[in-house]
Amino acid sequence: MALGARGWRRRSLLLLLLWVTGQAAPVLGLAVSSELQIQQSFVPDECPRTVHSGDFVRYHYVGTFLDGQKFDSSYDRDSTFNVFVGKGQLIAGMDQALVGMCVNERRLVTIPPNLAYGSEGVSGVIPPNSVLHFDVLLVDIWNSEDQVHIQTYFKPPSCPRTIQVSDFVRYHYNGTFLDGTLFDSSHNRMKTYDTYVGIGWLIPGMDKGLLGMCVGEKRIITVPPFLAYGEEGDGKDIPGQASLVFDVALLDLHNPKDTISIENKVVPENCERRSQSGDFLRYHYNGTLLDGTLFDSSYSRNHTFDTYIGQGYVIPGMDEGLLGVCIGERRRIVVPPHLGYGEKGRGSIPGSAVLVFDIHVIDFHNPSDSISITSHYKPPDCSVLSKKGDYLKYHYNASLLDGTLLDSTWNLGKTYNIVLGSGQVVLGMDMGLREMCVGEKRTVIIPPHLGYGEAGVDGEVPGSAVLVFDIELLELVSGLPEGYMFIWNGEVSPNLFEEIDRDGNGEVLLEEFSEYIHAQVATGKGKLAPGFNAEMIVKNMFTNQDRNGDGKVTAEEFKLKDQEAKHDEL
């Protein structure tokens, strides 16, 4: 079609624009520049690397003639074009046009025939002397000299251990191509990737890229394809010759040869006893994973964890880690998974997880323990010692082994009063009050099987708790011989019945009996068992004599204690 003057001027303007700005202009059928023309239609903000001669690239393109007719497109094949740059594998114009490109950069490239297919063209595809226009998007770039590239963007302040060959690790990752396209993510599966390092379970680049990492560290590992899935890709999501970028966060690390480790021990100055196999422990703990994630806490339940140690009641690592502790000790026990919950995990604990227990030992005892008595003060005259049947008045402070105060008579402002051996206190306390003199001060430690047992006292004494009583004996009233609730302090009148039966009617009623016994006690001629209700004792004595239960005692029914079978009362 012939062009008039106006049309010629328009074409000249467009060609000038193409030369000066690199903007592709529509061709109106006349000759164009013989120079390669490049327009950068998009350049990413970050460009850590550009294409150099000798690099291998993966890119998408759309190839058109200058009239807009498409002759080829990588998008139609759903595959990038993969090739070395500067090695004669491309037309000269494309070899030049790709140099200096960044990943994700987009270029519009116009290639004259002399830098394309020349006067011969490509039969059936590209006519001779064709100017070619390519819309190019660079997806990937690497060089055969590349190694694994590591960029650490977070490292915890404390890094006591790093990944070594043969370690087992648990980590999260996002896997992308160089252009940012996500191909896989452990986060999407909500499950860590768990594997050995350095023994061929991973692609070579990841085997190298993970070495030296700390738990809690985050790094970006860029892997060239020859250290990843190579020319063939993985057959699913990863194409051949693809560089891979892994954004990795290391959560866990151990070696199958690991044993438990004990850290951050805080041992009280006074440690008279250390735990042994067979002991029963009460302790608080926080249980976390290596990355600090809390999975359990006894504090949240407001109740200690109570267990035997060394007998398989807890995981092997804790069985071992709790040996040799002192009461009041704090320690951190790090348990590898083969001494914890293994490959399967348990509840909120993932498989193959290293566990960290921060424990505080509250108390422990052994089922074979008896009470422990430590006397702190004895008065100069300490000859009268407490025994079964004695009536005692004493003060005490009751606490747990960790010092937690449970009860105090001093706070209440009154003594605690009991008859020793009558079952009015726990067995360990009964034992701890024996052979004590007035004014003496002692500490009695009572194991739970001699205290309040596994159940404890709801809201007051924890189950299986060892108890500590600081005691001061203030008063001791000697009791009666075992089996007696009343005794005479002198000779008994041979006319006892007649003395009780003051009205001489041959019958003694309860009122008469009670009045007589109390009179004997008041004058010191008789003594009731101390610490018991006097009226109840007298009533029981009367009932024992009232053999036919008619509410009165006759001379025939009346007998003294030494005239009865054992344990009968007056």
Swiss-Prot record:
Domain of life the protein comes from: Eukaryota
Main location: endoplasmic reticulum
Residues the record lists as binding Ca(2+) 2: D546, N548, D550, K552, E557
Catalytic activity: [protein]-peptidylproline (omega=180) = [protein]-peptidylproline (omega=0)
Gene Ontology MF terms in the entry: calcium ion binding; peptidyl-prolyl cis-trans isomerase activity
PTM statement from Swiss-Prot or TrEMBL: Phosphorylated.
Motif (Prevents secretion from ER): 567-570
Name this polypeptide is given: Peptidyl-prolyl cis-trans isomerase FKBP9
Source organism per UniProt: Mus musculus (Mouse)
Lineage: Eukaryota, Metazoa, Chordata, Craniata, Vertebrata
